[in-house]
Design a protein with these regions (language model features):
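Non-heme Fe(II) oxygenase metal-center motifs and adjacent flexible, charged/small-residue loops
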Residues: 1-212
């Protein structure tokens, strides 16, 4: 499973730096439509290559399968989920979650509690158009904060209901993106397949209670 990953050409500076988050005051907000918005902060986690290596090594990555019509197909990525009462696998994840919780508490009104991780091994791994609408995300404004480590991949967004991609964010190497407001129920996001991916990527998604 993990052996399928193509080589990751990380920056020697990224690997040499202390692995730690920077300040959040450089965040840039993009207002979408219908009360949705996206915040973006490139390179929030310095030295993120170290975190990537640790997570690849220590996580019990799970290869999911799903029923599709008459066939059972492999989900094109590896996953691991940590609920609000579970211990996160790396102390830096606790730090990232707590910093984001404090920053967004005035808007969200509650902390981020869970962490879902996805490992995109190469450009063939992907996630289709969707919103995080399991639980309260289908009816309430919420926040999903995503920290990316490893090689960059494109996060695409479009209004719910179909149509062309309206916004693209290149995410990797410690980048942060936060989807907020009505984004999960009025917009969709995806990680498209890529023929130009330069290596594997891990997406770390922090969510509040009751949002998946």
């Amino acid at each position: 499973m993990i052996e399928r990953m193509i080589g990751l050409q990380g920056s020697i500076f990224d690997l040499a730096e202390e692995c730690a988050p920077g300040p959040l005051d450089g965040m840039q907000r993009t207002e979408l439509t219908r009360g949705a918005w996206v915040d973006h902060l490139p390179g929030w986690v310095q030295g993120s290559g170290q975190l990537f290596d640790r997570l690849v090594e220590v996580l019990p990555w799970h290869a999911e399968e799903r029923q599709m019509y008459d066939n059972v197909v492999a989900v094109p990525r590896l996953t691991k989920y940590y609920g609000s009462r579970e211990t996160l696998p790396d102390p830096l994840l606790d730090d990232l979650r707590d910093r984001l919780s404090a920053h967004y508490l005035p808007e969200l009104g509650e902390p981020l509690t869970s962490a879902g991780l996805c490992l995109y091994r190469d450009g063939a791994d992907s996630v289709a158009w969707h919103g995080d609408t399991i639980g309260r995300g289908s009816t309430h404004d919420t926040i999903v904060a995503i920290v990316s480590v490893g090689a960059a991949r494109t996060l695409a967004l479009r209004p719910r209901g179909g149509g062309p991609t309206a916004h693209r964010f290149s995410l990797g190497h410690g980048d942060l993106v936060v989807m907020g407001g009505s984004c999960q129920r009025t917009w969709e996001h995806a990680i498209p397949k890529s023929t130009s991916a330069t290596g594997p990527r891990i997406s770390i998604q922090f969510r509040p209670r009751g949002v998946r």
